[in-house]
Every structure is written in structure tokens, then in C-alpha cells.
Amino acid sequence: MDLPAYKKTFLNLKEKYQHQIQLFYGLELGLQPHLAKELPLLAASDSFDFLIGSAHIIDRLDPYCPEYFQGRSEQESYLRYFQVLLENLKTFSCFDTCGHIDYVVRYGPAKNKNYSYQAYREILDEILKVLIEKGIGLECNTAGFKYGLGHPNPTEEILLRYHELGGEILTLGSDGHAPKHLAYDFEKAGNL
């Protein structure tokens, strides 16, 4: 990523639209264990308003790619994702909120058909407790609706469990990588 070019574009847009919308400067950090030194330096390299930490790459594969699920069951694939996410959360503290903690479910062979909080309760509770202990928020990402899951990432059950465990920082995101997906189905999240 060309951070200086990104910042220049951001500042130009912030000035251009200052009377129409309030813009904040931030990044989504792709959490990976081998970046334990680099990501905190990147996070501290500029005056970001907000940073999201997310797991996308697990054992050198993105669950977006069907290859991630080859050679193991869907349950094993989901569990491995959560194990690596937990490892990342124990390693990193340089971000404000954790993005789409069950991202893997979007791309599973059966998506969320065989997925539930109860099936992964132990590790999901560990993940939520680490977030709470570190004062890191949990993102409610509405892209799950876009991908046909019928719920955000994470599910309402996980959002409620986060609150039960003492979690207080909840952020709202949509994986708006295209203008038409900005604030996608936010009205559904308001009902949670």
C-alpha cells in the first residue's frame, strides 16, 4: 500500500467534502503472526483516527479461496480460523476494533448452514475475553447480509455473548469496498 498517496487522497477528499460529511483516517490491518513487528510500527507511523484488525490469511490461504477448505472438514477449517485469530489477538494490540471475527463463514462450503456459536463456544469465548481484556472493540459487519448469510458477522448470538461477558465497544462496518456497499444494510444491524 502506498500510504503517502492514500493519505494525500484522503486529505483532499476530507477538504472537498468537509461541509457534507465527516471523514476519518484509518486502515484495516491484516493480522498475521509473522507481522508481529511490522504492524505495530505501521499503526504508530501516522495519526490514524481508527484502525481495524482483521484475520484474512490463515496458513497462507484466504478462506475466500476454495483451496483453504481442501484437505480438511468445514468444521476443522472454521476452528483453524478461530485458532489463528485468537493467536493474532494475543499478539497484537495496535488497533481499535476487531473486524468480522467469523469472516471464514462467508466462504465455507455450506456457509452458515452448519455454523453456530454453540459449536465453537469455547474458542469464541476466549476470543471475546481477549478483546474485552485489551479494550478492543468488536465489529458488527453487515456484509454477512450481502453474502446471503441472513445475519451480520458475527452472528447476533455472538454479539449478545460479547455483551454478557462485559464487552462494551461495538462498532458497525460493512466491508464497503465499493460505493454501493457503504453502510450496507445498516438498518438491519440497528435492530440487533
Question: Model-predicted segments: where are they?
Answer:
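Hydrophobic, aromatic-enriched interface-forming segments
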Residues: 74-112
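Charged catalytic cores and adjacent phosphate/nucleic-acid-binding surfaces used
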Residues: 59, 111-192
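Hydrophobic faces of well-ordered beta-strands that scaffold small-molecule active sites
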Residues: 23-27, 51-53, 97-99, 138-140, ...
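A metal-dependent hydrolase metal-coordination microenvironment
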Residues: 1-62, 66-79, 83, 181
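Acidic (Asp/Glu)-rich catalytic clusters
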Residues: 7-19, 39-52, 89-93, 126-135, ...
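Active-site beta-loop-alpha junctions enriched in small/polar residues
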Residues: 26-32, 56-58, 102-106, 141-145, ...
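Short, flexible active-site loops
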Residues: 65-70, 102-115, 141
